[in-house]
Amino acid sequence: MEQVKKAAIVLAAGHGKRMHSKVAKQYLLLNGEPVLVHALRAFEMSGMDTIILVTGADEVEFCRKDIVETYGFSSVKQVVPGGKERYDSVWNGLCALKAAGFPEDGIVLIHDGARPLVDGEIIARAVDGACSYSACVAAMPVKDTIKVADADGFSESTPDRSTLWQIQTPQAFRFELIYCAYEKIFAPGADRSHITDDAMVVELMTDTKVKFVEGSYSNIKVTTPEDMVIAEVLLYKGEKHVSF
Protein backbone atom coordinates (compact mmCIF):
# COMPACT_ATOMS: atom_id res chain seq x y z
CA MET A 1 0.00 0.00 0.00
CA GLU A 2 1.24 3.49 -0.87
CA GLN A 3 2.68 5.37 2.10
CA VAL A 4 0.63 8.55 2.37
CA LYS A 5 -0.78 10.71 5.12
CA LYS A 6 -4.21 9.48 6.18
CA ALA A 7 -6.98 11.42 7.86
CA ALA A 8 -10.50 10.53 8.89
CA ILE A 9 -13.44 12.89 9.24
CA VAL A 10 -15.97 11.23 11.54
CA LEU A 11 -19.42 12.79 11.41
CA ALA A 12 -21.41 12.89 14.64
CA ALA A 13 -23.52 16.03 14.32
CA GLY A 14 -26.82 14.37 13.46
CA HIS A 15 -29.86 13.95 15.70
CA GLY A 16 -31.85 11.22 13.98
CA LYS A 17 -35.56 11.44 14.74
CA ARG A 18 -36.21 7.84 13.70
CA MET A 19 -34.45 6.53 16.81
CA HIS A 20 -37.23 7.98 19.02
CA SER A 21 -34.71 8.69 21.78
CA LYS A 22 -33.81 11.81 23.75
CA VAL A 23 -30.17 10.77 23.38
CA ALA A 24 -28.58 11.26 19.94
CA LYS A 25 -27.98 7.90 18.25
CA GLN A 26 -24.19 8.32 18.21
CA TYR A 27 -24.16 8.49 22.03
CA LEU A 28 -26.43 5.51 22.70
CA LEU A 29 -24.62 2.71 24.51
CA LEU A 30 -23.61 -0.31 22.47
CA ASN A 31 -22.06 -3.06 24.59
CA GLY A 32 -21.52 -0.48 27.34
CA GLU A 33 -19.84 2.17 25.18
CA PRO A 34 -21.26 4.96 23.00
CA VAL A 35 -21.84 4.05 19.35
CA LEU A 36 -19.43 6.84 18.37
CA VAL A 37 -16.64 5.33 20.46
CA HIS A 38 -16.76 2.08 18.49
CA ALA A 39 -16.43 4.00 15.21
CA LEU A 40 -13.60 6.21 16.45
CA ARG A 41 -11.70 3.24 17.85
CA ALA A 42 -11.66 1.52 14.45
CA PHE A 43 -9.93 4.54 12.89
CA GLU A 44 -7.64 5.10 15.88
CA MET A 45 -6.42 1.51 15.53
CA SER A 46 -6.01 1.81 11.75
CA GLY A 47 -3.08 4.20 11.86
CA MET A 48 -4.76 7.48 10.99
CA ASP A 49 -2.37 10.42 11.18
CA THR A 50 -5.25 12.63 12.23
CA ILE A 51 -8.93 12.33 12.98
CA ILE A 52 -11.33 15.26 12.82
CA LEU A 53 -14.49 14.67 14.86
CA VAL A 54 -17.42 16.77 13.67
CA THR A 55 -20.21 17.10 16.18
CA GLY A 56 -23.10 19.35 17.14
CA ALA A 57 -22.06 22.87 18.06
CA ASP A 58 -23.37 22.42 21.61
CA GLU A 59 -21.63 19.04 22.00
CA VAL A 60 -18.05 20.00 21.13
CA GLU A 61 -16.87 20.31 24.74
CA PHE A 62 -18.72 17.15 25.77
CA CYS A 63 -17.03 15.19 22.99
CA ARG A 64 -13.60 16.57 23.86
CA LYS A 65 -13.88 15.54 27.49
CA ASP A 66 -16.25 12.59 27.62
CA ILE A 67 -15.36 10.92 24.34
CA VAL A 68 -11.86 11.89 23.17
CA GLU A 69 -10.16 12.33 26.56
CA THR A 70 -12.07 9.65 28.45
CA TYR A 71 -11.34 6.97 25.85
CA GLY A 72 -7.82 8.17 25.04
CA PHE A 73 -8.22 8.85 21.32
CA SER A 74 -4.83 10.43 20.67
CA SER A 75 -5.40 10.57 16.90
CA VAL A 76 -8.38 12.91 17.29
CA LYS A 77 -6.63 16.22 16.76
CA GLN A 78 -9.71 18.45 16.54
CA VAL A 79 -13.37 18.43 17.51
CA VAL A 80 -15.20 20.92 15.30
CA PRO A 81 -18.84 22.00 15.12
CA GLY A 82 -20.95 20.64 12.31
CA GLY A 83 -23.66 22.31 10.28
CA LYS A 84 -27.33 21.96 9.51
CA GLU A 85 -26.86 19.35 6.79
CA ARG A 86 -24.40 16.49 6.37
CA TYR A 87 -22.56 18.30 3.58
CA ASP A 88 -22.11 21.33 5.86
CA SER A 89 -20.45 19.11 8.46
CA VAL A 90 -18.19 17.47 5.88
CA TRP A 91 -17.14 20.88 4.57
CA ASN A 92 -16.30 22.04 8.11
CA GLY A 93 -14.15 18.94 8.56
CA LEU A 94 -12.38 19.45 5.24
CA CYS A 95 -11.71 23.10 6.07
CA ALA A 96 -10.23 22.05 9.42
CA LEU A 97 -7.87 19.67 7.61
CA LYS A 98 -6.93 22.39 5.12
CA ALA A 99 -6.18 24.87 7.91
CA ALA A 100 -4.02 22.25 9.64
CA GLY A 101 -1.88 21.86 6.51
CA PHE A 102 -2.97 18.36 5.52
CA PRO A 103 -1.17 17.47 2.27
CA GLU A 104 -3.06 17.65 -1.02
CA ASP A 105 -2.00 14.13 -2.00
CA GLY A 106 -3.07 12.68 1.36
CA ILE A 107 -6.04 10.37 1.75
CA VAL A 108 -9.13 11.48 3.66
CA LEU A 109 -11.80 9.02 4.75
CA ILE A 110 -15.26 10.36 5.58
CA HIS A 111 -17.30 8.16 7.90
CA ASP A 112 -20.66 8.24 9.64
CA GLY A 113 -20.17 8.13 13.40
CA ALA A 114 -23.38 6.08 13.58
CA ARG A 115 -21.67 3.15 11.80
CA PRO A 116 -20.01 1.48 14.80
CA LEU A 117 -19.15 -1.86 13.18
CA VAL A 118 -16.67 -0.59 10.62
CA ASP A 119 -13.40 -2.50 10.93
CA GLY A 120 -9.76 -2.26 9.99
CA GLU A 121 -10.15 -4.38 6.87
CA ILE A 122 -12.80 -2.07 5.39
CA ILE A 123 -10.70 0.98 6.27
CA ALA A 124 -7.59 -0.53 4.68
CA ARG A 125 -9.47 -1.33 1.47
CA ALA A 126 -10.81 2.22 1.35
CA VAL A 127 -7.34 3.71 1.77
CA ASP A 128 -5.92 1.38 -0.88
CA GLY A 129 -8.79 2.19 -3.24
CA ALA A 130 -8.28 5.93 -2.87
CA CYS A 131 -4.54 5.52 -3.48
CA SER A 132 -5.26 3.64 -6.70
CA TYR A 133 -8.35 5.46 -8.02
CA SER A 134 -8.43 8.81 -6.13
CA ALA A 135 -12.06 8.19 -5.10
CA CYS A 136 -13.77 5.12 -3.67
CA VAL A 137 -16.63 4.10 -1.43
CA ALA A 138 -17.32 1.05 0.69
CA ALA A 139 -20.27 -0.74 -0.89
CA MET A 140 -22.08 -4.06 -1.08
CA PRO A 141 -24.38 -5.59 -3.72
CA VAL A 142 -28.05 -5.17 -2.85
CA LYS A 143 -29.83 -8.33 -1.75
CA ASP A 144 -33.43 -7.35 -2.38
CA THR A 145 -35.30 -6.52 -5.56
CA ILE A 146 -35.50 -2.74 -5.93
CA LYS A 147 -38.42 -1.02 -7.65
CA VAL A 148 -38.88 2.56 -8.81
CA ALA A 149 -42.19 4.12 -7.76
CA ASP A 150 -44.19 6.75 -9.59
CA ALA A 151 -45.64 9.85 -7.91
CA ASP A 152 -48.75 7.90 -6.86
CA GLY A 153 -46.88 5.05 -5.20
CA PHE A 154 -47.27 2.49 -7.98
CA SER A 155 -44.41 0.40 -9.33
CA GLU A 156 -42.96 2.04 -12.41
CA SER A 157 -39.90 -0.07 -13.21
CA THR A 158 -37.52 -2.68 -11.82
CA PRO A 159 -33.80 -1.95 -12.26
CA ASP A 160 -31.40 -4.79 -12.95
CA ARG A 161 -30.33 -5.83 -9.45
CA SER A 162 -26.86 -6.83 -10.65
CA THR A 163 -26.09 -3.15 -11.25
CA LEU A 164 -27.28 -1.91 -7.85
CA TRP A 165 -25.05 -1.40 -4.82
CA GLN A 166 -25.72 -0.40 -1.25
CA ILE A 167 -23.40 2.51 -0.46
CA GLN A 168 -21.76 2.74 2.95
CA THR A 169 -18.97 4.69 4.60
CA PRO A 170 -16.07 5.20 4.80
CA GLN A 171 -15.81 7.05 1.50
CA ALA A 172 -12.19 7.82 0.69
CA PHE A 173 -10.55 10.39 -1.57
CA ARG A 174 -7.36 12.21 -2.40
CA PHE A 175 -7.63 15.32 -0.28
CA GLU A 176 -7.17 17.82 -3.11
CA LEU A 177 -9.92 16.10 -5.14
CA ILE A 178 -12.58 16.07 -2.43
CA TYR A 179 -11.68 19.52 -1.09
CA CYS A 180 -11.92 21.16 -4.51
CA ALA A 181 -15.16 19.31 -5.31
CA TYR A 182 -16.75 20.53 -2.08
CA GLU A 183 -15.38 24.02 -2.66
CA LYS A 184 -17.38 24.10 -5.90
CA ILE A 185 -20.67 23.08 -4.29
CA PHE A 186 -20.15 25.79 -1.67
CA ALA A 187 -19.63 28.47 -4.30
CA PRO A 188 -22.20 31.29 -4.20
CA GLY A 189 -25.42 30.23 -5.87
CA ALA A 190 -24.59 26.52 -6.03
CA ASP A 191 -27.52 24.16 -5.36
CA ARG A 192 -26.58 21.65 -2.66
CA SER A 193 -30.06 20.49 -1.70
CA HIS A 194 -29.88 17.20 -3.62
CA ILE A 195 -26.47 16.09 -2.29
CA THR A 196 -26.72 12.86 -0.28
CA ASP A 197 -23.12 11.67 0.01
CA ASP A 198 -19.52 12.59 -0.75
CA ALA A 199 -19.20 10.38 -3.82
CA MET A 200 -22.06 12.33 -5.37
CA VAL A 201 -20.11 15.57 -4.93
CA VAL A 202 -17.15 14.07 -6.80
CA GLU A 203 -19.43 12.66 -9.51
CA LEU A 204 -21.09 16.03 -10.08
CA MET A 205 -18.10 18.34 -9.77
CA THR A 206 -15.21 16.37 -11.27
CA ASP A 207 -14.42 13.91 -14.06
CA THR A 208 -13.13 11.31 -11.59
CA LYS A 209 -15.00 8.01 -11.47
CA VAL A 210 -15.75 6.60 -8.04
CA LYS A 211 -14.61 3.01 -7.44
CA PHE A 212 -16.51 0.55 -5.24
CA VAL A 213 -14.49 -1.36 -2.64
CA GLU A 214 -15.80 -4.17 -0.50
CA GLY A 215 -17.66 -3.04 2.59
CA SER A 216 -19.61 -5.39 4.84
CA TYR A 217 -23.25 -6.27 5.34
CA SER A 218 -22.50 -5.84 9.05
CA ASN A 219 -21.35 -2.25 8.53
CA ILE A 220 -24.82 -0.94 9.30
CA LYS A 221 -25.83 2.62 10.10
CA VAL A 222 -27.65 2.83 13.41
CA THR A 223 -30.83 4.72 12.54
CA THR A 224 -33.74 2.96 14.25
CA PRO A 225 -34.17 1.06 17.54
CA GLU A 226 -34.10 -2.19 15.56
CA ASP A 227 -30.63 -1.29 14.27
CA MET A 228 -29.33 -1.10 17.84
CA VAL A 229 -30.58 -4.61 18.52
CA ILE A 230 -28.91 -5.92 15.35
CA ALA A 231 -25.65 -4.12 16.16
CA GLU A 232 -25.63 -5.58 19.70
CA VAL A 233 -26.04 -9.10 18.31
CA LEU A 234 -23.33 -8.64 15.66
CA LEU A 235 -20.93 -7.16 18.18
CA TYR A 236 -21.63 -9.91 20.70
CA LYS A 237 -21.02 -12.62 18.12
CA GLY A 238 -17.94 -10.88 16.80
CA GLU A 239 -19.46 -10.81 13.31
CA LYS A 240 -18.24 -7.35 12.39
CA HIS A 241 -17.36 -8.44 8.87
CA VAL A 242 -19.83 -10.18 6.60
CA SER A 243 -18.53 -9.83 3.06
CA PHE A 244 -19.59 -10.76 -0.47
Task: Annotate each PLM feature.
Residues 84-149, 168:
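Conserved beta-loop-beta/alpha segment of the NTase-like Rossmann-fold superfamily
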Residues 2-63:
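N-terminal glycine-rich phosphate-binding loop and ensuing alpha1 helix
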Residues 46-47, 69-75, 101:
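Short helix-capping segments at alpha-helix termini
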Residues 148-173:
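Short, flexible, basic/aromatic active-site loop/helix in glycosyltransferases
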Residues 10, 36, 93, 112, ...:
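Residue-level signal for inorganic ion chemistry
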Residues 2, 165-244:
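Conserved alpha/beta core of the MobA/IspD/sugar-nucleotide pyrophosphorylase nucleotidyltransferase superfamily
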Residues 49, 106, 208:
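Short acidic/polar active-site loop segments enriched in Thr and Asp
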Residues 72-84:
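Conserved donor nucleotide-binding strand/loop of the catalytic core
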